[in-house]
Amino acid sequence: MKALTARQQQVYDLIRDHIEQTGMPPTRAEIAQRLGFRSPNAAEEHLKALQRKGVIEIVSGASRGIRLLMEDETGLPLVGQVAAGEPLLAQQHIEGFYQIDPSLFKPGADFLLRVNGMSMRDIGILDGDLLAVHKTQDVRNGQVVVARIEDEVTVKRLKKQGNMVQLLPENCDFQPIVVDLREQSFTIEGLAVGVIRNGDWI
């Protein structure tokens, strides 16, 4: 099943919320008005895209003919910006849920993290990509990990020796991050197991 774009997720959330509040789906005109589309036709195009992705069914011949096919909050949570001092998977950090089978990744993915920056460019992890992450602290030197240093979350290649950790970039424009475990707070949040390019699941 394909991931939803941010706009498609908005349309889906609106449909779900409207059903919860009124007991019925919104019309195309109501969707267009609520989300600022120029016309109901624009809403219709988004609905067709959602149907192609398998999350709704359009029932022909009815102005409110929309049926949700996916349950809320299923799939892999997408983690966006992480606030200092808060758990990575805190509810306020989750931007949405992507309908992706975790078993497509080895080991299985537990969440997606939006990549910020180009420090891992040379191994194909680019700014804006979604990184599939297996939540574990059991990692080895040389693996690409999601790590938290103090209150900062970063994606780097791990090199640990004694009380010293180096987090190595894959881009010569960036310097390694050196962590002294005797002086700094350091946590492994997970192991990188795959990449979804710019939010497009293919």
Swiss-Prot record:
Catalytic activity: Hydrolysis of Ala-|-Gly bond in repressor LexA
Example GO biological process: DNA repair
Catalytic-site annotation from UniProt: 119, 156
Keywords noted in UniProt: Autocatalytic cleavage, DNA damage, DNA repair, DNA replication, DNA-binding, Hydrolase, Repressor, SOS response, Transcription, Transcription regulation
GO molecular function annotations of the record: DNA binding; serine-type endopeptidase activity
Site (Cleavage): 84-85
EC number: 3.4.21.88
Positions of the DNA-binding region: 28-48
Annotated NCBIfam families: lexA
HAMAP family listed in its UniProt record: LexA
Family affiliation: Belongs to the peptidase S24 family.
Role this protein plays: Represses a number of genes involved in the response to DNA damage (SOS response), including recA and lexA. Binds to the 16 bp palindromic sequence 5'-CTGTATATATATACAG-3'. In the presence of single-stranded DNA, RecA interacts with LexA causing an autocatalytic cleavage which disrupts the DNA-binding part of LexA, leading to derepression of the SOS regulon and eventually DNA repair.
Subunit structure: Homodimer.
Annotated protein name in UniProt: LexA repressor
Gene name of this polypeptide: lexA
